[in-house]
Amino acid sequence: MNLALHTLSLAGSETLNDGFAATLLAGGCQLVDVRSPDDFMRDALPGALNLPVEVLSYDFRHLDKHEPVIVYGAHPVACVRAARLLAGQGFSRIYHLAFLRM
């Protein structure tokens, strides 16, 4: 599985360089898995929090607004929706992770 990290903006997303993505994934970020609890239990990324979009819309207290957040899940639309919810709550460094299957 290949990974691509994108930054969210209202205009779209931008692919980040591999070095920056590696730095974030190595521990300088908060990982939010927006999939169902069952999917999360099956194969979550290490250190990720399970906050499905339905939960994230009212409960984001486990996240620090001052730290970068990477949102990932099975569906890009859910990731973008979650990222926009976080942006609306004052989070500014929000990224979404795209899983590219080859």
Where are these regions (language model features)?
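Flexible, polar/low-complexity N-terminal or interdomain linker segments that lie immediately upstream
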Residues: 1-42
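Catalytic cysteine-centered active loop of the rhodanese-like fold, especially the PTP/DSP P-loop
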Residues: 60-102
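Short, conserved active-site loop motifs that form the nucleotide-linked donor/cofactor pocket
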Residues: 29, 48, 94
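Short acidic-hydrophobic, aromatic-tinged amphipathic segments that line or gate anion-handling sites
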Residues: 51-52
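Conserved small-residue
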Residues: 32-33, 48, 86
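Alpha-helical scaffolding within the catalytic cores
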Residues: 55-58
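Short loop/helix-cap segments at secondary-structure boundaries that form the rim of catalytic
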Residues: 40-46, 60-63
